[in-house]
């Protein structure tokens, strides 16, 4: 998930350099969304992993 976020961030930076403002904004928004989703997934996995085993 974080790999995709970094990919879209690089696309946003490259598009911004070449003057494609609309594409840069969209790619940056996608990168932010993927980062937040990935961060939420990591936090959920941490919380789920800390539960004691049920017998």
Curated annotation (Swiss-Prot):
Keyword Nucleotide-binding set for record: no
Family, per entry: Belongs to the UPF0391 family.
NCBIfam families for this protein: PRK13682.1-4
Keywords for the protein's UniProt record, in alphabetical order: Cell membrane, Membrane, Transmembrane, Transmembrane helix
Domain of life: Bacteria
InterPro entries cross-referenced by the UniProt entry: DUF1328
GO cellular component: plasma membrane
Recorded topology in the membrane: Multi-pass membrane protein
Organism: Thiobacillus denitrificans (strain ATCC 25259 / T1)
HAMAP family the UniProt entry points to: UPF0391
UniProt key word Transmembrane helix: yes
Subcellular location: Cell membrane
Protein name: UPF0391 membrane protein Tbd_2772
Cited Pfam families: DUF1328
Transmembrane segments: 1-21, 28-48
């Amino acid at each position: 998930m974080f790999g995709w976020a970094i990919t879209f961030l690089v696309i946003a930076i490259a598009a911004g350099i070449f003057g494609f403002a609309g594409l840069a904004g969209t790619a940056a928004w996608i990168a932010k969304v993927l980062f937040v989703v990935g961060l939420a997934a990591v936090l959920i996995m941490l919380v789920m992993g800390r539960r004691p085993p049920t017998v």
